[in-house]
Structures are given as structure tokens and as C-alpha cells.
Amino acid sequence: MTATRFRRGISSYNGQRGESGDGNRTLWNTSISYPLMGSYWFFTPKVTYSFTHYNDIKHAKAGIDSSSSRSLPIYSLDTGLIFERNSTIFGRETEQTLEPRLFYAYIPYRNQRHMPNFDSSLADLNFAELFTPNKYSGYDRIANTNQLSAVLTTRYIDSGTGKEWFSATVGQRYYFTDEKVDLYWDTPGKTKNRSDVLAATQFSLFEGWRLEGAIQYSTEWSKISKTSAGIRYNPRDFSTVALYYRYNYNPNDKREDFYNTNIKQVDFSFQWPIMKDLYGLGRYNYSFRDKIVVDSLMGLEYRAGCWILRGAVQRYIRSEGRSTTNFFLELELVGLGTVGSSPIQALSEGITGYKPVGPKPVEVGRYDYYE
């Protein structure tokens, strides 16, 4: 159970989200599942009960109740097969898999137009989202749905080392009912029978090197709406360098350039040892369309015997002509806790493949376990 108090600050909400006002929200979610699996199959039914209660809602737009509740069940079924065969490719013994997977979800309709929306938004479509019942992030909106996601994956695994050196995945979601739940209070529901098509591939023929690519094909516009391609070098833990190019296309977004979702960006990030137990961290995210650096980050991590020190500075553009600079400094006392503001979330979101530096491994002497 989670209880949260929302208050409007100077910059807490804007636009329609600010019309939700102030108030309290209490959540309670419980679920039960029964996983079944064999050597080449799995079958997992799941039922979730979700209850949300709002009270003491003030300063909200007309039509939002001062007190309201929502309760509903969420049904899902996740199932798949794994087929395997052995082959020889490029002179190496390889195990190839073919993995079809289906995810079905059903959520009945509940009218939510009289409820506030503090933190829900439309989740970005990706492969993880295809296996999620609710298309909205946050807790204030739960979409009605009767949907089926179909995903097909193939992997090539080195028979000698067990390492995966190639994979490709394609997937799409199909809808069997119209959407009725909207994010806000004057947005009509949408009618469609399928989502965009997602495809992704990874290739790591050489040790430590990985090529990655992904596309999203719009079934509405009949063209590619999102592209991501990049290369990453990750020879060992806490050592990674990545370079990516990202392109988004949305002809329906007519907002001025800085605010719309059409992007052309290059993203460079790294985590790399400078000297023993000292690691450098950085990110440089540049927009070709706006001709500005939209996000940059620099930091250091140092680990001693029983403590770890992390520091970082992040600067990002939050609106046209305005930027925000964040400073992070955290001291982690191994086994006791942390002091200061942690940069781990910013580093994890900004640096591809980032892993927080852990404590030094304990050196075991020859007589440490002698009895």
C-alpha cells in the first residue's frame, strides 16, 4: 500500500496536469500468479487487483470529485515456446533458438474522468511495454483493454562459451476493443486494431564489441517513425563506451521545434577506469535539429576499502533558452548506508551499460577458512 500527498508547487505541474489540484492518493495492489514451465515452454496466468482512492482534492478543475475511488481486476497470460537447433556459422559451432511469445491482457472499463491525474502519461512503446497490461505509466490512469502482443525472437549462441553473439526480435500488439480511458478530461478515446511494429537486433562478433539497432514502423503513417543505431564497447565490468544515433518522426506534432517529439540526436557516453579504483563518467547528448547540447554529464567514482565516493555534475535543457544544472555528491559507507545526493539514477539513465562501482572484493588468505 502506498499513500502520497500531492501539492502544487511553482513548477510542479503545468497545463492539463496542473488542473488536478492538490490532494491525497492511496494505492493498494495485490496479485497472484501461477507459473508453469518445462524445458521448452512456459505458461503464466496472473490476476491483479488494483484499488486507488483520492480524497481532499482541492483547487482542481470543475468535474473532478473531491473524493473518489477506483477498483478493478487486471488479467494477463504470458506464454511462449523455445525451439533449439545446432548449426555451424562462420566456422563456429552455434546453437540457434526460435522463441515465439504471446502476452494477452484484459482490463475492464472504469470511468476515470472525475479523477485527478497527478503522474500518468502514455508509456513509450518498446518491447518491455508489449508485455505490460496498462499502456499508461504512473498510477492515475488504467486503460481498458483486450489485447494480444506477439513477439518472435531468434538468438545465436556460441556452443563453446555459451555467449550470445547475435539476436533479432520483432513484435506487435493487437487490440480487440476500442479505448475509452483517456489521460485527461477532454481527449477522446482512440480506435485502432494494432500498434506500430517494433524490430531490434544485436550483433557482437568480437569480444566486448556490440552493434545495436532498432526501428519502430508506424502503421498509421506507413513509414519508420523511430530509429536507433549504435556501437558499444564493454570489455569488462565498470568499463563501457557507447555511441548512438536516434531519430524520431511524428508528423502530428506541430509544436515549435524545441517542444515537439521529432528528434535527430547523437549520444556519446562512457564509464572508464582512470587509475586504480578511480573511474571517470560522462555523457554528451547533441541535437542536430536544435544545434545544441541537450544533456551533458561528467562525474567520478572512487572506491576505497570500506567506502565509495561518487560525484557528478549534470546540465540539461528543460525549455527553450533555459537549462538546469544538478550537482551530486554521495558517500557510501559499505554495509551501513549512504550520505548525500545520489547520482546513480542520473548515471544509469544517461550512460549506456553503467554499473555502480561496488566495494572492493575481499582478498582471502590461505588460512582464512582453516579449522
Regions found by a protein language model. Give the residues of each.
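Outer-membrane beta-barrel proteins and related beta-barrel translocases across Gram-negative bacteria
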Residues: 1-371
